[in-house]
């Protein structure tokens, strides 16, 4: 019983350790994420963005975000851990060092008289005759008496000096950190221990791993359902027009899970009538088109109507239930659009090329959803008003009036501050405050520059079948001097970081693609340094040359550039006029493209190498043949010489015989 009691005190320590192993790193990760979110506060300062409220949290929102299930669980576990720490700190230790001077309340090296005096004083307090308390009796016998004996009895003192205890060498015990009620079970503790071991160490991890694998098997790395990716891959076509991208985008499995309520039928009818002009219906077959529209899946209908409400900036009229569905649709939109463009540019043909036209349509849809600009404004017309509509205080009439004056959004940006202010005040009668808001947004809009090359590393030209290296430096500049920033998007209810997609394309074929982000400077520096090092070392560059190239790349990254590099197989012989696009998924009107001429030569390197190898093989064959002939020629010559000698001997013998005769 005593042994089980001593071992059971280890159980709180065991529980404390098992809780601390996952809880401490998880808490650290949550705190680091919260800190990084606070650091990423570089967003637009215009009145519309401030009025949207997504960058400012009310007290109720802060409380609700803090009182989430995961946060409350973490706080509760920390409270339990603090209690266990306090409990283990105050409970008696399983084994303590025997300190006789400390037990008697003396300093080490005290005299015999001081030892006896202290013993008498403690005997009055703890002796069984003076104090009937069992705990006092136990303390007196096990501690005070042994301490006095260790300091006064010669044998006990010798044992204490040798072994640290007056009774001599002490053994040690090993216990199991389990609660006392399990250890007290007669003959049943083994089964309980076996069940606990199997359950906690084998079954529980297997169950957790099975649940994780079952859930992760349904999603991609971007938290998009595999069912959605498969649908996107099958529905995309190479000649897909931008106006048809919406029909594929809303087929996501995430949107099929939106609840369909009978109470929303009337509201959806009103939504349909309000956005009817934006639904791309054929006016010649309007009734048939409407009937075809309502035959779609109810969740698909609701999704498309809610997205159209976002594009027309009329989401404020939605009912509370539709508002929840509206937020659900927009929350999934960025990751679904990213997966959709990946399915557009993923290699499909034998040459490993994707499709450019669907990718451009996906980027247009993404820009319109984030900036809440109708797709009809992107259609070709005499005035390109779509970029103007992303500015604060701009509507369609104001955008058309300004577009007539400056012809293009780029020229509007190139105007001086005074000229632009005068134009906005006199032509469309905007106030000074409105003009200041517009200037704040114009200072946030990035301008891009592309510098792209395509070559075969270590060779003078590109030959068919080579592994080409595509290297592009994307440089971003803003009038306000920022590099990474949260874009102006007052009508998009969630935080949205700006991303850029680099596409290298020939006609409708995408040769190469990569996503670029400007928020993470440290990650970009590390990626550029590793890429430069891995590229130069195989070419035999010296350490100094590699370090200089890395240093130059780091300076470029810090000044607002990002390195994009990839490798692809060179096509057949010919001249290819490629176009490198840099597309924003957030801003309208800042996309850039540049031309790149790639000349692929006929394959000659391997042929020359093969000819050289054949020449070497022929020379080797000739040498071997000469060696072969020389061996046998020597034998034949030896035979001839032998026969000649034999003939000479015979002739000489004949001559000698004739002489004798």
From Swiss-Prot:
What are the subcellular locations of this protein? Endoplasmic reticulum membrane
Q: Its topology with respect to the membrane?
A: Multi-pass membrane protein
Which residues carry attached sugars according to the database record?
Answer: 90
Q: Which residues lie on this side of the membrane: Lumenal?
A: 1-8, 87-190
Q: Where is this region: Disordered?
A: 608-661
List residues traversing the bilayer: 9-29, 66-86, 191-211
Keyword list (alphabetical) reads: Chaperone, Endoplasmic reticulum, Glycoprotein, Membrane, Protein transport, Transmembrane, Transmembrane helix, Transport
Regions of biased composition (Acidic residues) lie at: 609-637
Domain J residue range list: 99-164
Q: What is this protein called?
A: DnaJ protein ERDJ2B
Protein's gene: ERDJ2B
